[in-house]
Amino acid sequence: MDALKSAGRALIRSPSLAKQSWGGGGRHRKLPENWTDTRETLLEGMLFSLKYLGMTLVEQPKGEELSAAAIKRIVATAKASGKKLQKVTLKVSPRGIILTDNLTNQLIENVSIYRISYCTADKMHDKVFAYIAQSQHNQSLECHAFLCTKRKMAQAVTLTVAQAFKVAFEFWQVSKEEKEKRDKASQEGGDVLGARQDCTPSLKSLVATGNLLDLEETAKAPLSTVSANTTNMDEVPRPQALSGSSVVWELDDGLDEAFSRLAQSRTNPQVLDTGLTAQDMHYAQCLSPVDWDKPDSSGTEQDDLFSF
């Protein structure tokens, strides 16, 4: 909860930071001085300009060897096609990953954070970022890969997704607790109403009045719920503000089930598995976003497929 409050306060202090985009070859205006400042903008979303390599199906929700093999297939397919890679913007937040086309600004993909089971900066193709997520249409697992300008960018995106997942998990925990409290209160309220009906011969109008009073009390409650009748199973609800300066998200049953199932596959249910080593994580955390756009010391960068 302390992490949520801290992130919320940081976002209020600097909401404009979330509008910036990294990896776009100088499109940004001013970047945070360190990774901590960047991390604080997650609630609204961080933008990364990448190139989409493609997607392939995988059999398991996580694994370094599994993702490496999937990325190898994706890269081989992209090379064989001979087509220019699609330039995209990746927006990462605790809600998930939103993928849009840079030229048309058209939405390509909107993946709930609760469906993502793994992300990595590939070791063989060191400028590739990839994530594995459960399809919103069925239970198949998809590996999506993206070409970054350099390895440090791929590491930064991976770290951002992992951090977004951590915040989202805390939202989920709070949401579950609040839902249990509401269900318990609702059950107790129903028991009281039933007892009144048993002992008092009331008219239907009196029962209706009692229901209206219950609705008024519900409307005054600090938590507002999201309808579970949504037609989009991957539509991630907006966080609802609570009187205690906390944030709660309501999940539909489909997302809740998917998140719970994927949690069983993780090494630690509270942490998104990544392909980053402890050294990689430390290096990425020490980076300034300004460094992400600097050319590598090896010379002029080429961002086409054949520079691997």
Swiss-Prot record:
Domain of life: Eukaryota
Gene3D superfamilies: Pleckstrin-homology domain (PH domain)/Phosphotyrosine-binding domain (PTB)
Residue(s) carrying N-acetylmethionine: 1
Disease cited in the entry: Hypercholesterolemia, familial, 4: A form of hypercholesterolemia, a disorder of lipoprotein metabolism characterized by elevated serum low-density lipoprotein (LDL) cholesterol levels, which result in excess deposition of cholesterol in tissues and leads to xanthelasma, xanthomas, accelerated atherosclerosis and increased risk of premature coronary heart disease. FHCL4 inheritance is autosomal recessive.
Record-linked CDD domains: PTB_LDLRAP-mammal-like
Entry keywords, A to Z: Acetylation, Atherosclerosis, Cholesterol metabolism, Cytoplasm, Disease variant, Endocytosis, Hyperlipidemia, Lipid metabolism, Phosphoprotein, Steroid metabolism, Sterol metabolism
Positions of short motif Clathrin box: 212-216
Motif [DE]-X(1,2)-F-X-X-[FL]-X-X-X-R motif, chain ranges: 257-266
Outcome recorded upon mutating residue 214 to A: Abolishes clathrin binding
Phosphoserine: residues carrying this PTM: 14, 186, 202
Role, per record: Adapter protein (clathrin-associated sorting protein (CLASP)) required for efficient endocytosis of the LDL receptor (LDLR) in polarized cells such as hepatocytes and lymphocytes, but not in non-polarized cells (fibroblasts). May be required for LDL binding and internalization but not for receptor clustering in coated pits. May facilitate the endocytosis of LDLR and LDLR-LDL complexes from coated pits by stabilizing the interaction between the receptor and the structural components of the pits. May also be involved in the internalization of other LDLR family members.
Alphabetical list of SMART domains matching this protein: PTB
Subcellular location: Cytoplasm
Record-linked InterPro entries: Adapter_Engulfment-Domain, PH-like_dom_sf, PTB/PI_dom
Region annotation (AP-2 complex binding) ranges: 249-276
Recorded consequence of changing residue 256 to R: Abolishes interaction with AP2B1
GO molecular function: amyloid-beta binding; AP-1 adaptor complex binding; AP-2 adaptor complex binding; clathrin adaptor activity; clathrin binding; low-density lipoprotein particle receptor binding; phosphatidylinositol-4,5-bisphosphate binding; phosphotyrosine residue binding
Mutagenesis or variant effect for residue 202 to H: In FHCL4; Lebanon; requires 2 nucleotide substitutions
One GO location term (cellular component): cytoplasmic side of plasma membrane
Subunit structure as annotated in this protein's UniProt entry: Interacts (via PID domain) with LDLR (via NPXY motif). Binds to soluble clathrin trimers. Interacts with AP2B1; the interaction mediates the association with the AP-2 complex. Interacts with VLDLR. Interacts with LRP2.
Name of the encoding gene: LDLRAP1
Boundaries of every PID domain copy: 42-196
Annotated domain remarks: The [DE]-X(1,2)-F-X-X-[FL]-X-X-X-R motif mediates interaction the AP-2 complex subunit AP2B1. The PID domain mediates interaction with the NPXY internalization motif of LDLR.
Name this polypeptide is given: Low density lipoprotein receptor adapter protein 1
GO BP of this protein: amyloid precursor protein metabolic process; cellular response to cytokine stimulus; cholesterol homeostasis; cholesterol metabolic process; cholesterol transport; low-density lipoprotein particle clearance; positive regulation of cholesterol metabolic process; positive regulation of low-density lipoprotein particle clearance
